[in-house]
């Protein structure tokens, strides 16, 4: 298949996620897609959003009752399904499902007047006042059932279901694919620091020392304009110590994506600062995003999309714990609660929530993405919590559970992996392409009610070692 082949476009999400031989992605549309779009079910637990050839859909996730998987038919090795799987996956990753709910007051940021007033007053409001205003805005967040808190894997589980259908249609016991992480690592973790205020700038050297004491390198995102002056010497220090420099918004005023023309003007300046800083990555202020506009950016990866956005001003979430491409930009989703949320919204100085998220993500081989602000993390209680997190991450690395990487390293790996191919035939599969020396051939198979992954020869384990996913088809 070539990239413009309609059949490949239909099956693109599955092929790109697993990097498996394209012959195993043999899905076709059953019927014609009906006008309109909405929510439906893909099995008893999963929610999808988009069009279907059945015409059944709901306006909200809670009202979704039609299970499209009941209407799958198989002819030969082809599965005929009543939806476009790549479109459904894109609708979740790019948060297009939020559009219909905004009409009901869900998923939008505060009104322009309220938000303008808040940002005008923000420099004069301490955290103690801001957190109470934010708690008022977030009231009732726990009633939202979709995306699933504290970690949502809807995209990953949809693709696992499709892979299971493919195995049954092809009558094979396993399907080869390129393992998600280099050198056979079970999962991945990145640590990032958004620098919000001048006090955070001053705290960067101390935070680097804390990170280094656990043998961990991280990335620092700096705001180029208005908030504070970015000392060139600090950028040089960050890079010299093996940490990473990235761009954090333009001026963090909350208006980056308000108007297309103004956004393009700002994007040009953001691209300029990315070149000046030697930065490959970006994160917008307050995790604002509009993924359909990312073609204006020149950076390599973005880190602005939460896995679950219930506790952010812009609600939504990408519903995956894996990196994914938005055009040429790689998205590294924020998959764990931010420190500000933990300390000031939940008033929690334990790492219990982080531990829950770590367990859910690592047992499903995903990306652990943490954002800890220098502005909030050096007060004693916060510092103690943060060092407990670092100790846990260091332990996971020693145990071989995570690849502790810089964001730019994940970006480079994921791009290499996307260019690799599996060639050969059953029993003689091989990986070809750039970076293949770090890649591991893996196999997905159905083991009872679970998808099971086995490695050909993972690092640090005997051949045939098994790792299990929590997917139940």
Can you annotate each of these PLM segments?
Residues 1-221, 225-229, 296-297, 328-473:
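Terminal accessory/targeting
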Residues 320-321, 327:
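Eukaryotic tandem repeat interaction scaffolds
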Residues 260-264, 318-320, 417-425:
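Short, surface-exposed amphipathic charged segments that create phosphate/polyanion-binding patches used
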Residues 186-191, 199-201, 208-315, 327-343, ...:
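Metal-dependent polysaccharide deacetylase catalytic core of the NodB/CE4 family, i.e.
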């Amino acid at each position: 298949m070539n990239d413009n082949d309609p059949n490949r476009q239909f099956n693109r999400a599955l092929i790109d996620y697993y990097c498996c031989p394209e012959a195993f992605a043999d899905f076709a549309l059953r019927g014609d897609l009906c006008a309109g779009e909405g929510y439906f079910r893909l099995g008893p637990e999963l929610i999808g959003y988009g069009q279907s050839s059945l015409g059944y859909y709901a306006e909200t996730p809670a009202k979704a009752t039609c299970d499209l998987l009941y209407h799958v038919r198989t002819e030969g090795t082809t599965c005929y399904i009543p939806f476009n799987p790549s479109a459904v996956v894109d609708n979740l990753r790019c948060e297009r499902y939020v559009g219909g709910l905004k009409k009901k007051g869900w998923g939008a940021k505060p009104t322009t007047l309220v938000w303008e007033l808040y940002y005008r007053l923000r420099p004069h409001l301490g955290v103690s006042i801001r957190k109470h205003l934010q708690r008022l805005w977030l009231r009732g967040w726990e009633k939202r059932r979709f995306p699933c808190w504290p970690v949502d894997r809807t995209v990953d589980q949809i693709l696992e279901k499709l892979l299971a259908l493919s195995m049954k249609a092809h009558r094979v016991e396993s399907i080869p694919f390129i393992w998600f992480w280099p050198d056979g690592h079970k999962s991945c973790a990145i640590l990032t620091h958004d620098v919000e205020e001048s006090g955070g700038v001053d705290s960067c050297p101390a935070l680097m020392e804390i990170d280094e004491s656990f043998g961990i390198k991280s990335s620092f995102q700096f705001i180029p304009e208005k908030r504070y002056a970015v000392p060139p010497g600090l950028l040089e220090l960050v890079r010299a110590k093996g940490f990473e420099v990235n761009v954090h918004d333009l001026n963090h005023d909350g208006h980056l994506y308000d108007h297309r023309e103004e956004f393009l003007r700002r994007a040009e300046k953001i691209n300029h600062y990315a070149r000046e800083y030697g930065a490959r990555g970006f994160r917008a202020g307050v995790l604002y995003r509009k993924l359909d506009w990312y073609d204006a950016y020149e950076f390599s990866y973005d880190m602005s999309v939460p896995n679950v956005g219930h506790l952010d001003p812009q609600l939504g979430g990408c519903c995956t714990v894996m990196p994914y491409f938005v055009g040429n930009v790689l998205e590294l989703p924020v998959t764990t609660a931010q420190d500000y949320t933990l300390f000031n919204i939940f008033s929690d100085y334990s790492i219990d929530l982080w531990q829950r998220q770590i367990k859910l993500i690592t047992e499903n081989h995903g990306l652990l993405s943490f954002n800890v602000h220098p502005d909030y993390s050096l007060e004693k209680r916060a510092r103690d919590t943060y060092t407990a997190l670092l100790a846990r991450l260091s332990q996971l690395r020693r145990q071989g559970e995570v690849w502790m990487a810089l964001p730019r390293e994940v970006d480079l790996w994921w791009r290499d992996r996307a260019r690799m191919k599996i060639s050969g035939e059953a029993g003689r599969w091989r990986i070809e392409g750039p970076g293949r020396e770090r890649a591991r051939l893996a196999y997905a198979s159905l083991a009872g009610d679970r998808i099971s992954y086995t490695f050909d020869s993972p690092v640090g384990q005997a051949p045939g070692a098994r790792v299990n996913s929590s997917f139940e088809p």
